[in-house]
């Protein structure tokens, strides 16, 4: 294999790797958006649950665990 053929092969590999990196970056961005949306929904549901729990048993104090 000549030096020129090796150079061409390396350029092809670099181009393929750049494409893969771009695709993975796009997927990762979408996943972070999904995680953020799910986190917001979970927080809203947690708050709603605590409200309903307080309404169901108003004499029993509801306290969030320290990690909330």
Swiss-Prot record:
Gene3D superfamilies in the cross-refs = 1.20.5.300
The coiled-coil regions, if any, are none
Fetch the Pfam families from UniProt. SlyX (PF04102)
Query: Which organism does this record belong to?
Result: Brucella canis (strain ATCC 23365 / NCTC 10854 / RM-666)
Specify the protein name: Protein SlyX homolog
Q: Which family does the record assign?
A: Belongs to the SlyX family.
Please, which domain of life does this record's source organism belong to?
A: Bacteria
* Cited PANTHER family: PROTEIN SLYX
Annotated InterPro entries: SlyX (IPR007236)
For this chain, the annotated S-S bridges are none
